A protein has these predicted regions:
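Active-site bordering "gate/hinge" segments
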Residues: 1-227
Length: 227
């Protein structure tokens, strides 16, 4: 993330012509995922996205520019170009920046991004192996884990200075029962905005058992009566 001083330089540049308001929006996203089929890893990946948006307003006129390059000098030039493009006739001063306020959407005890993928694989494999050994009718087990972390920073010419971080996790386990040419599934896919403590506390074996029972019950169920 950019420092307060560099963000203020960007806002000063944005307000240097006719803008009566300017704000800077910075967003950083991280994600990690892993998927298993019958206990074998079939996909694993991570991603990182970072970008900044600069908005200038003069009355009802708005100019918005954005970039994924957080070089301060380049962003100052971008803000100056936006200021040149904005139509208006006012000249406002920039208020002193507030102390940065950090918030988190939920109480995170263990950052999921700090967990190695091997631990995620071991967690999912435990569910997959249980499902495959539960009953001969269960012929396939699919499991996945996805986590994402989003940090947003908003600073404006009125002195606002806020930053918020949110974290999300979703796991999914699916058991497939087969009988002849017919297949039926049982599945659970809980999501949370907690940290990795959610995974440590989750009764994955109990839930996997429920998935298997659902799939087996469905495969033996008759058709609903018509009429």
């Amino acid at each position: 993330m950019l420092s307060d001083s560099n963000i203020m330089r960007i806002i000063d540049a944005a307000m240097s012509k006719t803008a009566d308001f300017a704000d800077v929006f910075i967003e950083e996203r991280k994600s990690s995922n892993v998927g298993l089929l019958n206990g074998k890893v079939i996909k694993a990946g991570s991603s990182f996205d970072l970008g900044i948006g600069i908005r200038l307003m003069a009355g009802t006129n708005v100019v918005y520019v954005y970039s994924n390059d957080l070089n301060p000098d380049g962003l100052i030039k971008l803000a100056l170009d936006a200021a040149d493009a904005l139509k208006g006739n006012s000249l406002c001063s920039v208020k002193e920046l507030e102390s940065k306020c950090f918030t988190t959407a939920t109480d995170i005890k263990i950052d999921p991004m700090s967990i190695k993928k091997k631990e995620n694989v071991d967690f999912l494999r435990k569910a997959s192996e249980y499902a495959l050994n539960y009953d001969p009718g269960i012929t396939q087990a699919v499991a996945s884990y996805v986590t994402g972390k989003r940090t947003v920073r908003i600073v404006n010419s009125d002195g606002l200075n806020k930053e918020e971080t949110s974290q999300r996790i979703r796991i999914s386990v699916e058991a497939v029962a087969t009988k002849g040419n017919e297949k039926q599934t049982g599945r659970f896919a809980p999501g949370t905005m907690r940290g990795y403590e959610f995974i440590n506390e989750y009764p994955v074996i109990d839930k996997t058992r429920e998935c298997c029972e659902t799939a087996l019950r469905m495969i033996d169920a008759g058709y609903a009566p018509s009429g």
